[in-house]
Amino acid sequence: YQLEISSWDKFSITGKILETILQTKDISNKNIWIVVAMPNKWSKAELIVQKLSEIWVDEIYFRPSERSVLKDWNNKKWERLQKISQEAVEQSRWWKLPKIEFVKNIFPVLQNKKIIVFDMVDQKVIPSCDSQANIIWVVWPEWWFTQKDYENFWKNFDLISLGDTVLRMETASIVWAWSLRNSLR
């Protein structure tokens, strides 16, 4: 905004808005849900939460995969992730904290949603998303999905790739979320 300040004191500033310079679209009704396999280090989980919160992801689900080193978390870890998320949301000037959960049983989260799995086996690019679609995006675990992951977890899914570049799972989570958020604008 371009403002004209008429007065100020210790507690308030009074002024008039002369011009709105930046206009943004309302994207508050366009949801992004991401399922991420538990990484092998807590610092990676913290990075994922921080960056996905900055990108305005609505729900972040961590799940143990067959190859996950970390299989569970406690309240102290969850509180730390919440604090990281809040700081990231404040920094990015958003108003809504993402829901952050650890789920051992992913099936209730997946119900009534189109599942798109981000994997290296297919070369499709990210589709343009219907803003009203219930789509949940799933990012691979470290060392990729196993055959058991495919058989047990994903029955009705599409495979998507960001291309030939092999990305770490935390980088893929961030790149994918950013691409999705920008496609919904």
Segment roles from a protein language model:
Residues 104-111, 123-126, 166-167:
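A short acidic, often aromatic-flanked loop/helix-cap motif at beta-alpha or helix-coil junctions
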Residues 1-24:
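N-terminal positively charged helical leader segments and presequences
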Residues 20, 64-68, 164:
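Short, ordered loop/turn segments at secondary-structure junctions
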Residues 39, 121, 165:
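Active-site beta-loop-alpha junctions enriched in small/polar residues
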Residues 147-185:
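Structured adenosyl-cofactor binding patch, chiefly the S-adenosyl-L-methionine
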Residues 25-114:
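RNA substrate-binding interface of SAM-dependent RNA methyltransferases
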